[in-house]
UniProtKB/Swiss-Prot annotation:
Protein name from the UniProt record: NADH-ubiquinone oxidoreductase chain 3
Catalytic reactions on record: a ubiquinone + NADH + 5 H(+)(in) = a ubiquinol + NAD(+) + 4 H(+)(out)
Family: Belongs to the complex I subunit 3 family.
Originating species: Felis catus
This protein's record includes keyword Mitochondrion: yes
């Protein structure tokens, strides 16, 4: 019963905060809030220029590989466990997945963002 009450309270509170955050900015619409800000000076150009989608994909790929490298960091400590064959198999699978992912990105020209 206490868990259900806590879940209901958290759900209602978070819903209320989301609704307030959604409706509050619509009350004060000023032109200054919609304009870009460059250190107090007038903008030199348009700040609403689109960026390259290829660059975005390279950045996402970098983040994914960085996260997978973080999975490899505990391997030296994991090698001291009793289940060494299981650890080596999992490490080999993870490294194989990284190599296959890199090869796929390379063949699909996903690492080239200049056009």
């Amino acid at each position: 019963m206490n868990v259900m009450l806590a879940l209901l309270t958290n759900t209602l509170l978070s819903t209320l905060l989301v609704l307030i955050a959604f409706w509050l900015p619509q009350l004060n619409i000023y032109a200054e809030k919609a304009s870009p800000y460059e250190c107090g000076f007038d903008p030199m150009g348009s700040a609403r220029l689109p960026f390259s989608m290829k660059f975005f994909l390279v950045a996402i790929t970098f983040l994914l590989f960085d996260l997978e490298i973080a999975l490899l960091l505990p391997l030296p400590w994991a090698s001291q466990t009793d289940k060494l064959p299981t650890m080596l198999t999992m490490a080999l699978l993870l490294i194989s997945l990284l190599a296959a992912s890199l090869a796929y990105e390379w063949t699909q020209k996903g690492l080239e963002w200049t056009e």
